[in-house]
Amino acid sequence: PFQVSKAVETDDEVMVECRYYSNAGCDVIFRDFPHEFKCKIIFHLSARGLEQEVVFTNRSRERMPLGVGFHTPLRIPFAGGENGDYVMRVAVGEQAELDARNLPTGRKLPLNAQFARLREGGLRVTGCEPIEAGFKLREIEVDGKPYRGALVENLRTGVRVFYEVDDRTTYWTIWNNGGQVPYCCPEPQSWTTNAPNAADPEAEGFCAVAPGESWSAKYRLYVRQAGE
């Protein structure tokens, strides 16, 4: 359903812009979500990495609830070696207790010994047991600087893949599809899963966009050597 609306290539970068419109006349989503809106995603690929901006504009006459998340798989291994050479770190805070349907109950739990390694030291997330967990976002330190995002590091070579998010992201779902596949998904979300039905939706990141207004968020994927 997305259409490429702009594409520019220079010596330094490639930019692609895609747009998607939802309204009563052309989109089945409108039947279940009766708000007319425009979604625009802009990609910039350069020496800085892959930068992504998503923009939603409310074209309806009522406030539009909006929660944005990405199901982002990071391949592991990605630079040679074995699963055991790689660890993931993520800017996580408290863990969200999940019910039998994997929906947050509203209770926040301190990180256990396993998930505390996401903040410091790193956690092996492939070739291991299944992981399906949700967390509030809290910045970590990487090389002495505050960092808001996830990263995967090859401990043998020092090569790192960073997945950086802005302050629109408030929650992570981390999922490794059983643990025996060559990827793990640190999934950034603007609100806690099922936030509209929470006891305190705003505390879980719930937001609504006013008519004619826009909401945007930015993300960046890039590769660095440890210490750079």
Regions found by a protein language model. Give the residues of each.
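Residues that act as N-cap/strand-start positions at coil-to-secondary-structure junctions
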Residues: 1, 35-37, 82, 144-146, ...
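Extended, loop-rich substrate-binding clefts of extracytoplasmic carbohydrate-active enzymes
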Residues: 1-47
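A short, structured loop/turn motif at beta-sheet edges
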Residues: 5-16, 44-49, 78, 82, ...
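Short, well-ordered beta-strand segments enriched in hydrophobic/aromatic residues
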Residues: 41-43, 50-58
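Short, acidic/polar linear motifs in exposed loop/turn regions
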Residues: 59-61, 225
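Active-site/ligand-binding surface loops and adjacent short beta/alpha elements
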Residues: 63, 73-166
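Active-site pocket scaffolds in enzymes
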Residues: 156-227
